[in-house]
Amino acid sequence: XXEQKLEGMNEVIKMMD
């Protein structure tokens, strides 16, 4: 689902921080 895709994006944002 889409939820899984959102989780992956969240991880990328955390790494960017």
UniProtKB/Swiss-Prot annotation:
It comes from the Bacteria. On the 2D-gel the determined pI of this unknown protein is: 5.1, its MW is: 38.9 kDa. This is Unknown protein CP 15 from 2D-PAGE.
